[in-house]
Curated annotation (Swiss-Prot):
Primary localization: membrane
Gene Ontology process terms (BP): endocytosis; ventral spinal cord development
Protein name: Low-density lipoprotein receptor-related protein 8
UniProt keyword list: Calcium, Cell membrane, Disulfide bond, EGF-like domain, Endocytosis, Glycoprotein, Membrane, Metal-binding, Receptor, Repeat, Signal, Transmembrane, Transmembrane helix
Tissue: Mainly in brain.
GO terms, molecular function: calcium ion binding
Membrane topology annotation: Single-pass type I membrane protein
SMART domains: EGF (SM00181), EGF_CA (SM00179), LDLa (SM00192), LY (SM00135)
Function: Cell surface receptor for Reelin (RELN) and apolipoprotein E (apoE)-containing ligands. Also binds alpha2-macroglobulin. LRP8 participates in transmitting the extracellular Reelin signal to intracellular signaling processes, by binding to DAB1 on its cytoplasmic tail. Reelin acts via both the VLDL receptor (VLDLR) and LRP8 to regulate DAB1 tyrosine phosphorylation and microtubule function in neurons. LRP8 has higher affinity for Reelin than VLDLR. LRP8 is thus a key component of the Reelin pathway which governs neuronal layering of the forebrain during embryonic brain development.
Disulfide bond residue pairs: C29-C41, C36-C54, C48-C63, C68-C80, C75-C93, C87-C104, C109-C123, C116-C136, C130-C145, C149-C161, C156-C174, C168-C183, C188-C200, C195-C213, C207-C224, C241-C259, C253-C268, C273-C285, C280-C298, C292-C307, C313-C326, C321-C339, C333-C350, C355-C366, C362-C375, C377-C389, C395-C405, C401-C414, C416-C429
Organism of origin: Gallus gallus
Localization annotation: Cell membrane
Membrane-traversing stretches: 839-861
Sequence ranges on the Cytoplasmic membrane side: 862-917
């Protein structure tokens, strides 16, 4: 009787155990996931979103009624979207209710916008009217527009407008030659020189070491009495071109024409490539692995010519046999063996629809195949584990949107920053307000091109050799460097053509200024000098200046600043080409790019998207990185469009560059590098280029004016410190070259002050762990970095401070040469005064000596006492038997009066055993 009952009980226990184990083996989802009844895991945010993501609808069961916020629009299916997405021309509601006629009643456009017509609910900025770009679907914004050219302009046959001064000047400024048609024979004025080809140039340009006539007659030896090329002296590591240019010596006979006259590739021996290399059609050598890799590495694209594409069984209409063959998909399960191993005719799989059972385990779409099945996902989703679909975060692609990318389930949304609006046709963000225009150098003049109307005019004429420029939009000023005069100038743009309005800012200690940048927030100007191998800074009026860097620079060229984050960036095309970054006060210098870079010329900053762009004249490329040097990308690699790029600028979704070899200005999409177009041709050594628009220079607080004291309390220069963290210092004080900051870190002295600063001893101090302060010594020969201890207490000296987070900068003249000494302190740290240091040492040393003497006396006494102590152990068997679980007791009898004093079981006479040194 008991055995059957026991058996049934045992069987019941086994069943319960099986159920328990089955339950325990149930798949567990992560904390940020929702577990469906069918054990599927989905993101927790997908629950109760009106979508059946579990496929059993368990994620939509027992959901509370959803109420959209006041700033949201409620879709008819219950979804909530931002109200600004309603009636924007794109359906964000899955049911399209946000773009329905009921929701989109006729909009009333505000005063600063115009309507796209009765059949459209779209409003566009008034500045987009008659800008040459169709922004309304109907094109009504470009209808009935008057001719674009003003009375002082000439309209070319291609409808572009140029300054009337460019007509019949011997140059094809229109691009189609219409400005040089029907021109009477040129007659040069008394202040002009006539070239042998009858072209007139200013007399000022004759014998200036730069050929302006196509036949070089203005620089001939007969006229000038000397060979202009003899005046250019190249360094030992450089090669002098036939026209006097200097290039790196290792660029000679490398297969790439770097000299403008191509003399670096003349009389070169026949190039022989190594066995592991491929020789291009032009003779250059590339690594053999780069041949037929679907990337054009040779300048003539010969590395990709004649390549045989490997056959792959990747087409949906193909089937890959397990034995390796690739057969037509229609031959699968047709009762005929087409694969050697019969893998196209599996008996147990042909004719079976796996999707009929639980949707094949697919979370969304199950596609039955002749053999097996596969899971698919709707648009905006991707397979996570071959069965489960997950949302695609399109915003992970930095090129997904022009500016702002917002990812949501199954799709994404692009938006624009303040000051920009989305063009619904191109999906690009366009600037609102005045038309942007390009300003660029053209050797003897500065010109501008309106990017909307394509107006083309001259700003500054009659210059010698302008190579660098920048603008300050708020004040409408332009700054430029003239390489011939070795000076930096400034003027108001609308008055710059008048030489009387041109102000000389810097006219001394300049050798070869090739880059200039304006800090429009803190009103400073920065420039590079490849001759002096320095980077310098001055106030915008040029009254106060100093050298920021004078070491580890070879050929510094372009420079750009970011006053909002308080950093500067520059390119150096010397022996070790690189792009560097540092704070506007010279702190935190670091290399961003040092590999795969040869001849970096122009650089430019996209402040909105935090990207740095640069062109490489040796690699014929246009590349970009983020502000930390990461996410590097080559946008364009073309020897035709980037023959010798120099200047660079970026705005909206376009990047612009000048090219010395093509003598033109190009433009391309800054995200993809596609849509390359020519904006201006037939130029004369175009170098630098900038975009003039108010959105290019956003407003930001002046760090030096946040202090209660003017100029941050600095006697000379107040330089903004880089913004690294919320606790970063705001600025540092700086002195002119060969002068020192005083103890107060604000005043400047010709010699290091010897009079100590007043010291206030605080009544109480708060102890902190010792810190360190870095001292960087930058000299003409080398760079030394030392570490000095920082004050231990929080307050030791009374040094006036203009701001609680102000970093202090000490500049000094080293006795060994013109070197700069800069000591940077933390936010709340104070500098050591020499008197305070001496006082601290005078107190600490005696205390340490007395402490050591006391410790030595104590150790001698303890050692003597232990030597005069004897131990005896008594073993009582009876006592031990009754206390066998207790530890063994020891009784110590000493010669001293301290009878019965208990010592540790182990008596050590060695000082090392006591843990003492």
């Amino acid at each position: 009787m008991c055995r059957p009952a026991l058996a049934r009980l045992l069987l019941l226990q086994l069943l319960l155990l099986k159920l328990y184990l089955g339950k325990g083996a149930m798949k567990e989802c992560d904390k940020d996931q929702f577990q469906c009844r069918n054990e599927r895991c989905i993101p927790a945010v997908w629950a109760c979103d009106e979508d059946n993501d579990c496929s059993d609808n368990s994620d939509e069961a027992d959901c509370p009624k959803k109420t959209c916020a006041e700033t949201d629009f409620a879709c008819d299916n219950g979804h909530c979207i931002p109200d600004r997405w309603k009636c924007d021309g794109e359906e964000e509601c899955s049911d399209g209710s946000d773009e329905s006629e009921a929701a989109c009643t006729k909009q009333v456009c505000p005063a600063e916008k115009i309507s796209c017509g009765d059949l459209s609910n779209k409003c566009i900025p008034s500045s987009w009217r008659c800008d040459g770009q169709k922004d309304c679907e109907s094109g009504i914004d470009e209808a009935g527009c008057a001719p674009a050219c003003s009375p002082d302009e000439f309209q070319c046959s291609n409808k572009t407008c140029i300054s009337i001064n460019f007509v019949c000047d011997g140059y094809n400024n229109c691009g189609d030659g219409s400005d040089e048609k029907k021109c009477s024979p040129l007659t040069c004025s008394p202040n002009e020189f006539q070239c042998n080809n009858s072209v007139c140039i200013p007399q000022l340009w004759v014998c200036d070491n730069q050929a302006d006539c196509e036949d070089h007659s203005d620089e001939s030896i007969e006229r000038c009495g000397y060979d202009a090329k003899a005046f250019n002296t190249c360094a030992a590591h450089e090669f002098q071109c036939g026209n006097g240019e200097c290039i790196l010596l290792n660029w000679k006979c490398d297969g790439d024409e770097d000299c403008k006259d191509k003399s670096d590739e003349q009389d070169c021996p026949l190039v022989t490539c190594r066995p592991d290399e491929f020789q291009c059609g032009d003779g250059t050598c590339i690594h053999g692995a780069k041949q037929c890799d679907k990337v054009h590495d040779c300048p003539d694209n010969s590395d990709e010519a004649g390549c045989v594409q490997e056959s792959a069984c990747e087409s949906p209409s193909k089937f890959q046999c397990k034995s390796g063959e690739c057969i037509d998909g229609g031959k699968v399960c047709d009762l005929h063996r087409d694969c050697r191993d019969w893998s196209d005719e599996p008996l147990k799989e042909c004719g079976i629809n796996e999707c009929s059972l639980n949707n094949g385990g697919c979370s969304h779409i199950c596609k039955d195949l002749k053999i097996g099945y596969e899971c698919e996902c709707p648009p905006g989703y991707k397979l996570l584990d071959k069965k489960t679909c997950g949302d695609i975060d399109e915003c992970e692609n930095p090129d997904a949107c022009s500016q702002i990318c917002i990812n949501y389930k199954g799709d994404y949304k692009c938006e624009c920053y303040e000051g920009y609006e989305m063009d619904t046709l191109s999906k690009n963000c366009k600037a609102v307000g005045k038309s942007p225009y390009l300003i660029f150098t053209n050797r003897h003049e500065v010109r501008k091109i309106d990017l909307v109307k394509r107006d083309y005019s001259r700003i500054i004429p009659m210059l010698k050799n302008v190579v660098a420029l920048d603008v300050e939009v708020a004040t409408n000023r332009i700054y430029w460097c003239d390489l011939f005069y070795r000076k930096i100038y400034s003027a108001y743009i609308d008055k710059a053509s008048d030489t009387a309005e041109q102000v000389i800012l810097i006219d001394s200690q300049l050798n070869s200024p090739e880059g200039v940048a304006i800090d429009w927030v803190h009103k400073n100007i920065y420039w590079t000098d490849s001759g002096n191998k320095t980077i310098s800074v001055a106030t915008a009026d040029g009254s106060r200046r100093r050298t920021v860097f004078n070491s580890d620079l070879s050929e510094p060229r372009a420079i750009a600043v970011d006053p909002t984050r308080r950093f500067m960036y520059w390119s150096d095309w010397g022996d070790k080409a690189k792009i560097e970054k540092a704070g506007l006060n010279g702190v935190g210098r670091q290399v961003l790019v040092s590999d795969n870079i040869e001849w970096p010329n122009g650089i430019t900053l996209d402040l909105l998207n935090q990207r740095l762009y640069w062109v490489d004249s040796k690699l014929h490329s246009l590349s970009c990185i983020d502000f930390n040097g990461s996410n590097r990308e080559v946008l364009i690699s073309s020897i035709d469009d980037l023959s010798h790029p120099f200047g660079l600028a970026v705005f909206e979704d376009r990047v612009f560059w000048t090219d010395l070899e093509n003598e033109a200005i190009f433009s391309a999409n800054r995200l993809s590098g596609l849509d390359i177009s020519v904006l201006a041709e037939n130029l004369n050594n175009p170098h630098d280029i900038v975009v003039f628009h108010e959105l290019k220079q956003p407003k930001a607080p002046d760090s030096c004016e946040l202090s209660p004291q003017p100029n941050g309390g600095c006697e000379y220069l107040c330089l903004p410190a880089p913004h690294i963290s919320p606790r970063s210092p705001k600025f540092t004080c700086a002195c002119p070259d060969n002068m020192w900051l005083g103890p107060d870190m604000k005043k400047c002295y010709k010699e290091l002050p010897t009079t100590p600063a007043t010291v206030e001893v605080p009544t109480t101090t708060t102890s902190h762990p010792a810190a360190t302060s870095t001292v960087t010594v930058t000299g003409s020969a080398n760079t030394t970095t030392a570490v000095i201890p920082r004050a231990v207490s929080e307050a030791t000296t009374a040094i006036p401070s203009s701001h609680s987070t102000t970093s202090l900068l000490i500049d000094s003249e080293m006795t060994t040469g013109n070197s700069n000494l800069s000591q940077h302190y933390s936010n709340n740290g104070q500098g050591f005064d020499s008197t305070v240091t001496a006082a601290v040492i005078g107190i600490v040393i005696p205390v340490v000596v007395i402490g050591l003497l006391c410790m030595g006396g104590y150790l001698i006494w303890r050692n003597w006492k232990r030597k005069n102590t004897k131990s005896m152990n008594f073993d009582n068997p009876v006592y031990r038997k009754t206390t066998e679980e207790e530890d063994e007791d020891e009784i110590h009898i000493g010669r001293t009066a301290q009878i019965g004093h208990v010592y540790p079981a182990r008596v050590a006479l060695s000082l090392e055993d006591d843990g003492l040194p």
